[in-house]
Swiss-Prot record:
It is an enzyme of class 1 (oxidoreductase). PANTHER family: PHYTOCHROMOBILIN:FERREDOXIN OXIDOREDUCTASE, CHLOROPLASTIC (PTHR34557:SF1). Belongs to the HY2 family. GO terms for molecular function: cobalt ion binding; phycocyanobilin:ferredoxin oxidoreductase activity. The gene is pcyA. This is Phycocyanobilin:ferredoxin oxidoreductase. GO terms for biological process: phytochromobilin biosynthetic process. Catalyzes the four-electron reduction of biliverdin IX-alpha (2-electron reduction at both the A and D rings); the reaction proceeds via an isolatable 2-electron intermediate, 181,182-dihydrobiliverdin. It catalyses: (2R,3Z)-phycocyanobilin + 4 oxidized [2Fe-2S]-[ferredoxin] = biliverdin IXalpha + 4 reduced [2Fe-2S]-[ferredoxin] + 4 H(+).
């Protein structure tokens, strides 16, 4: 059954989240609406989750879809009490089409957005993006932000076009959102025109995606938050089945 409405109006979290997160969630949903979406089935108990973290209520909303070119398109919205808002999004491609991985994360607190990262991460063995992506991204130019953040030790999975910043003002927030929209426009277009690869090339991109997921699972900050709220076993299951499931 095709998905024809990606409206986020049924989200209980959306109205309570940081404005930049709301803006970005709507932009992601709008870009996905142009693709032939079908539902992606998450484990039944992991679509909507409630827990407690250090006395605060933790709520997680997950939305997942798929297309012929993307095996899984995941948008997560989360809130911890009144102090922490989170957006997490990854588009996992089918290796058959040789596409990179789109990823975006926003973390916001009472003082505003503390971290914003977005990238089109390569799955080729040479760690380069396909030529068509490089051409389109180079034409965009590099946006300027005052506060660049340092990538984690496992950040070699990201491309040279990765943005990891702390926005200094509303103008920078809007600039970041626009760059994510640019990434998505390029990505969705390339997915539509992508041709199937050979078996050997498909295997190469499959291995690249496995490496990406394995590295992302090393994110100690995410794991610690989940472990505190739900325990180690639950956190491992969520990390490996919802956030970064390794393609079989």
């Amino acid at each position: 059954m095709a998905v024809t409405d990606l409206s986020l109006t049924n989200s209980s979290l959306m109205p309570t989240l940081n404005p930049m997160i709301q803006q970005l969630a709507l932009a992601i949903a709008a870009s996905w609406q142009s693709l032939p979406l079908k539902p992606y089935q998450l484990p039944e108990d992991l679509g909507y989750v409630e827990g407690r973290l250090e006395g605060e209520k933790l709520v997680i909303e997950n939305r997942c879809y798929q297309t012929p070119q993307f095996r899984k398109m995941h948008l997560e919205l989360a809130k911890v009490g009144k102090g922490l808002d989170i957006l997490h999004c990854v588009m996992f491609p089918e290796p058959l089409y040789g596409l990179p991985l789109f990823g975006c994360d926003i973390v916001a607190g009472p003082g505003g957005v503390s971290a914003a990262i977005a990238d089109l991460s390569p799955t080729q063995s040479d760690r380069q993006l396909p030529a068509a992506y490089q051409k389109s991204l180079a034409e965009l130019g590099q946006p300027e932000f005052e506060q660049q953040r340092e990538l984690p030790p496992w950040g070699e999975i990201f491309s040279e076009y990765c943005l990891f910043i702390r926005p200094s003002n509303v103008t920078e927030e809007e600039r970041f959102v626009q760059r994510v929209v640019d990434f998505l426009q390029i990505h969705c277009h390339q997915s539509i025109v992508a041709e199937p690869l050979s078996e050997a090339q498909t295997l190469e991109h499959r291995q690249g995606q496995i490496h990406y997921c394995q590295q992302q699972q090393k994110n100690d900050k995410t794991r610690r938050v989940l472990e505190k709220a739900f325990g180690e076993a639950w956190a491992e299951r969520y990390m490996s089945q919802v956030l970064f499931d390794v393609i079989q």
